[in-house]
């Protein structure tokens, strides 16, 4: 398994809405994530800084990257665009984090 972590932002006035939209996520999005090898996906909110910290374990970079081209992912990004900063293609603006420590 490959462990990934990344950070995104959420609009200051959208914390509750962001959480509401994720609980639960669309069943078809959950199915796509799982079928593309995503496991143990979690997102945490830093309310003071409007930051989202996400972790996920993936089976391969190729399968993880393929999620972005699915119809359901494209619809999800469009659905979330009003609650978080996004790129021109509607994907959330994010930065991948480098792992510096792991205790198993």
UniProtKB/Swiss-Prot annotation:
Residues binding substrate: 18, 41, 76-77
Catalytic activity entry: alpha-L-rhamnose = beta-L-rhamnose
GO biological process: rhamnose catabolic process
Pathway stated in the Swiss-Prot or TrEMBL entry: Carbohydrate metabolism; L-rhamnose metabolism
Main location: cytoplasm
EC number assigned by the record: 5.1.3.32
A GO molecular function held by the record: L-rhamnose mutarotase activity
Pfam families noted in UniProt: rhaM
Function: Involved in the anomeric conversion of L-rhamnose.
Family per record: Belongs to the rhamnose mutarotase family.
Protein name according to UniProt: L-rhamnose mutarotase
Organism: Salmonella dublin (strain CT_02021853)
Organism placement in taxonomy: Bacteria, Pseudomonadati, Pseudomonadota, Gammaproteobacteria, Enterobacterales
């Amino acid at each position: 398994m490959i462990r990934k972590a990344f950070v995104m932002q959420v609009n200051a006035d959208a914390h509750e809405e962001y959480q509401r939209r994720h609980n639960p996520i669309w069943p078809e999005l959950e199915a796509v994530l799982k079928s593309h090898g995503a496991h143990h996906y979690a997102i945490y909110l830093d309310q003071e800084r409007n930051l989202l910290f996400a972790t996920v374990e993936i089976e391969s970079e190729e399968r993880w990257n393929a999620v972005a081209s699915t119809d359901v992912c494209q619809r999800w990004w469009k659905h979330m665009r009003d609650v978080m900063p996004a790129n021109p293609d509607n994907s959330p603006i994010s930065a991948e984090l480098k792992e510096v420590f792991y205790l198993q």
